[in-house]
Amino acid sequence: GSRVLVGRDTFLAENGIDIVYLCPVTWADDDPREEFWSDRQKKSGLKNPQNPYRVKDYYRIDPEYGTDEDLLLFVKEAHALGMRVILDLVYYHCGPAAVFIKDHPDFVKRDENGQVKNGRWHFPEINFESAELREYLWKNMEYFIEKFDVDGYRCDVSPSVPLDFWEEGRKRMEALKPDVMMLAE
């Protein structure tokens, strides 16, 4: 996480690294129910519900990775050394205890009985038919550029997210940072 990397970016730069890609740093869901665990989590035998690709809060840094200040410092240090920093965006699915599910039940897909629909990794699937959800996620992209000065994003499971969502997101990111990077998985 960002706390571990602070002060190590000199080593990265000295070894020719000019882009640092951080896996999800947002607050991971630790819901213990195994029906929401990925196949890899189940097979590992570790009985650990935490998975950084099962997001609980898109606007909070997971304490396991540090604080907002840690990420700010890391990005600032990386930029001073000529490196760019990109974050992983996990928008195909979220965690079962995602903070928005209770207040915005339409942010996730539901079956005919109104139950949350899980995607292929057993995590609740995001509902891109919701205009409010799209705005929430575009604002999330803007948030990390504006607050932390990140240089772009790696878009997890990008083919499963509507292309027009990514296109609009790219336009909005370029308005903030013209040389923004977006990498599709």
Give the location of each predicted region.
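Substrate-binding/active-site clefts of carbohydrate-active enzymes
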Residues: 2-4, 11, 15-18, 24-148, ...
